[in-house]
């Protein structure tokens, strides 16, 4: 007998039981959350984080439509300040995690979460909270792309990376603000110091961009980061580290998704043969010296005619 053939009372009982189990599970998960962070900003409830992420996705959808008939914003100074501000923020996070884990005697192989109010543990938890906040601030990367009409930069990889990092790290801070969680955040914040340094330098304009030949190595660094994260997490599973197993497996799956996406980006950007462009220094159909391509072609053709002493049709 199927569920649809059951008596109304029994169906209601099944639904009621399922709802009660869900509520009990929710209460249980809340009971094992990290008490140290429960009153920190954004940590009382998931709704502020989910609301910010929803607004972000709405802007990704509506922003390009709003900018369609508008001139792109000129944001050089804003970008310089923002990018070097992110360098300082990530440097602060890296330093706090490194010093906190060092003083707490953390192991890079296996480290359980200490939920005590030990000064070093609270320092690590606070640094991880700042790391979570930094992922929310990074939504501005996308906002600036859209306001500058660089919509080609707002790829699936870009949106997936930004949206999931901020949203999922709320879970990390709520339940495991310490222990093994420090390693990935420490590694990622270090890479972001390098990454935002590059972006900050590019914001100065073309005169410095010729010295920034190392852009492709940023993607390689990120790919190495994901492989190191998987290896570190797999080692923790192998040693039966007393850290939530579900989070270990979730982290491995998450890192694998990034490897596929970043590898695809790297191949398309640096390995596939590029289509020939109309002119290396051309900007919107006009070359660097202000002469359009069609005018240049006519000048070349006229020069050939004069060299031969007569026009082609004479």
Swiss-Prot record:
Task: Decide whether keyword Lipid biosynthesis is in the record.
Answer: yes
Top-level taxon in the UniProt lineage:
Eukaryota
Q: What class of enzyme is it?
A: transferase
Positions of transmembrane segments: 42-62, 78-98, 127-147, 165-185, 188-208, 217-237, 247-267
| Alphabetical list of Pfam families matching this protein | ELO
* Compositional bias (Basic and acidic residues): 293-304
Question: What's its membrane topology?
Answer: Multi-pass membrane protein
Cellular component per GO, a single term? endoplasmic reticulum
Q: Could you list this entry's UniProt keywords, alphabetically sorted.
A: Disease variant, Endoplasmic reticulum, Fatty acid biosynthesis, Fatty acid metabolism, Glycoprotein, Ichthyosis, Intellectual disability, Lipid biosynthesis, Lipid metabolism, Membrane, Neurodegeneration, Spinocerebellar ataxia, Stargardt disease, Transferase, Transmembrane, Transmembrane helix
Reaction equations catalysed: a very-long-chain acyl-CoA + malonyl-CoA + H(+) = a very-long-chain 3-oxoacyl-CoA + CO2 + CoA; tetracosanoyl-CoA + malonyl-CoA + H(+) = 3-oxohexacosanoyl-CoA + CO2 + CoA; hexacosanoyl-CoA + malonyl-CoA + H(+) = 3-oxooctacosanyol-CoA + CO2 + CoA; octacosanoyl-CoA + malonyl-CoA + H(+) = 3-oxo-triacontanoyl-CoA + CO2 + CoA
Disulfide cross-links: none
What the entry says about domains is: The C-terminal di-lysine motif confers endoplasmic reticulum localization.
Which proteins does it associate with, and in what oligomeric form? Oligomer.
Pathology linked to this chain's protein: Stargardt disease 3: A common hereditary macular degeneration. It is characterized by decreased central vision, atrophy of the macula and underlying retinal pigment epithelium, and frequent presence of prominent flecks in the posterior pole of the retina.
Q: Explain the purpose of this protein.
A: Catalyzes the first and rate-limiting reaction of the four reactions that constitute the long-chain fatty acids elongation cycle. This endoplasmic reticulum-bound enzymatic process allows the addition of 2 carbons to the chain of long- and very long-chain fatty acids (VLCFAs) per cycle. Condensing enzyme that catalyzes the synthesis of very long chain saturated (VLC-SFA) and polyunsaturated (PUFA) fatty acids that are involved in multiple biological processes as precursors of membrane lipids and lipid mediators. May play a critical role in early brain and skin development.
Against PANTHER family, the record matches this protein to: ELONGATION OF VERY LONG CHAIN FATTY ACIDS PROTEIN 4, FATTY ACID ACYL TRANSFERASE-RELATED
Q: What is this protein called?
A: Very long chain fatty acid elongase 4
Q: To which species is this protein native?
A: Homo sapiens (Human)
